[in-house]
Amino acid sequence: MRRMFLSACLVLLAAASAACAQECDRSDDSQQMMNICAGEDYQAADARLNKAYQDLTNSDDADGKRLLQVAQRAWITFRDAECAHSTAASAGGSIHSMEVSQCLTRLTNDRVKQLAAAANCEEGDVGCANPGEDESDDVQ
């Protein structure tokens, strides 16, 4: 009985959340709408990231897949920590969720580019492992 009640509550909660969800309207410059749009932008970037990741794992052997999985998990941890740090000043404010979403979107889009470049590497191209690096920009 308890299990059925809990399931019913979850279904009602999901339905209520879906009914309250708003779509992005870029002509509305209220903070609430900017937060919604930034969240949708991040969701789109995350979908592109998942596709780029899947494309790369499909081309890797077992060891490559394992190493990519470890790298991706570490990158996600870094991304989340970096965005938490870089948006800490706005914590508690109405703009905070937008800033977090924008940070997540920016870093996620950068990662999509990295994964896409790695998926297009030719075997033996040692410079392809780190796309976009310019040796002239090395930190001294």
Question: Where do the PLM segments sit?
Answer:
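Bacterial N-terminal signal peptides that target proteins for export
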Residues: M1-C9
